[in-house]
């Protein structure tokens, strides 16, 4: 007499393969098991991560709605563990037990390009108000967010307009020192927590241009 666990498992995602940040991806698992009502547990592995995260614990529910809002863009791995209803798990690892496991690659995308311009272009006299305009293309969702920065001569970067949906910044140069500046923008998709980060914040894309005050 042989006791067997599940013999096959499958995992599919909708939308398939890739989606923009902010979309809820529906994962659907199926399996061939000796008994009715097998159990499914869903897992995710973030881009660059080494540890899997349980997204939905074992239950008889074979679907999981994975919200990508705030998730890091890039290559993910999505997985399901399957156990027969009468099985404690044919395999055991530090994270738990399963009869079978299946994983699929999945790509989450965000904004693909950023532009930045100034008017007057390139140079202006001290006292001029410079209009800085940014643009973002390829963003999965409407209303990306923009954060503007200035690098003054001999100084560090300073946020001059915090993240908002406004893609323009009016830079008053009254009282500013003449010299070479840099103007920059960080861009994030409306549903992105930022692909990259440092001590100053997070962003999906950035761009900068030199600017001279005379």
Give a label for each model feature:
Residues 35-41, 141-147:
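Solvent-exposed loop segments of extracellular immunoglobulin-like
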Residues 68-75, 173-179:
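Surface-exposed, short loops/turns at beta-strand junctions within beta-sandwich domains
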Residues 5-13, 109-118:
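Proline-enriched interdomain boundary motifs that mark the N-terminal boundary
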């Amino acid at each position: 007499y042989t006791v067997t666990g599940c013999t096959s498992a499958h995992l599919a995602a909708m939308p398939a393969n890739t989606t923009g940040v902010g979309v809820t991806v529906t994962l659907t698992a199926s399996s061939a098991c000796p008994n009715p009502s097998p159990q499914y547990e869903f897992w995710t592995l973030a881009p660059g991560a080494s540890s899997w995260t349980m997204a939905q614990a074992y239950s008889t529910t074979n679907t999981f709605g994975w919200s990508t809002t705030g998730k890091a863009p890039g290559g993910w791995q999505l997985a399901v563990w399957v156990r027969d209803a009468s099985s404690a798990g044919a395999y055991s690892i530090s994270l738990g037990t399963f009869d079978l496991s299946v994983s699929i690659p999945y790509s989450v995308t965000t904004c693909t390009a950023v532009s930045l311009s100034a008017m007057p272009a390139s140079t202006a006299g001290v006292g001029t108000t410079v209009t800085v305009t940014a643009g973002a293309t390829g963003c999965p969702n409407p209303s990306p967010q923009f954060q503007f920065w200035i690098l003054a001569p001999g100084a560090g970067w300073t946020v001059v307009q915090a993240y908002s949906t406004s893609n323009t910044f009016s830079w008053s140069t009254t009282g500013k020192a003449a010299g070479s500046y840099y103007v920059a923008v960080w861009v994030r998709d409306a549903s992105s927590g930022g692909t990259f980060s440092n001590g100053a914040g997070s962003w999906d894309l950035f761009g900068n241009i030199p600017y001279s005050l005379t």
